[in-house]
Amino acid sequence: MKDMKTIEGIIVVTTPEIPGYKVVEVKGVARGGTVRATHIGRDIMALLRNLKGGEVKEYTEMMAEAREEALRRMALHAKELGANAVVNFRFATSNLGGSMAEIYAYGTAVVVERVEK
C-alpha cells in the first residue's frame, strides 16, 4: 500500500474495488463525524459577503475542515475494526439548527491484499 495514498494508514476510495487489490475480509461499517457551529465572527463576515454576493469563504473553510476531520475519524474507526481500507466511501451532511451542521463520513471497512501479477 506504499504506492497508494492513505489516511491514517487506511486506503480510502469511493469505488467498490481498489485496482490491484482484492478484498479478503469485510469488517463492517466505518464511520466518523463532526458537528460544527458558526460563531459571531464568521456570521458577521458571512453577512457582509452575502450583501456583496459571492462565496462565503469563512463557511467554505469551516466545512472543508469538518470534512477532513470526519474523514480522519472514519479512517481511525476502520483501523479499530481491523481494516486496512475503506471502500464505497461517502459523505453525508445534516443541518442541526440554524448555526450547526453535522458532517458524517462512512464506508465499508475491509481488509485488502495486493493481487500478484
From Swiss-Prot:
**SUPFAM superfamilies per the record?**
YbjQ-like (SSF117782)
* Family note: Belongs to the UPF0145 family.
For this entry, the protein name equals UPF0145 protein PH1682
Q: Which Pfam families match?
A: YbjQ_1
InterPro entries per the record?
A: UPF0145_dom_sf (IPR035439), UPF0145_YbjQ-like (IPR002765)
Origin organism is Pyrococcus horikoshii (strain ATCC 700860 / DSM 12428 / JCM 9974 / NBRC 100139 / OT-3)
- The organism's taxonomic lineage, starting at the top: Archaea, Methanobacteriati, Methanobacteriota, Thermococci, Thermococcales
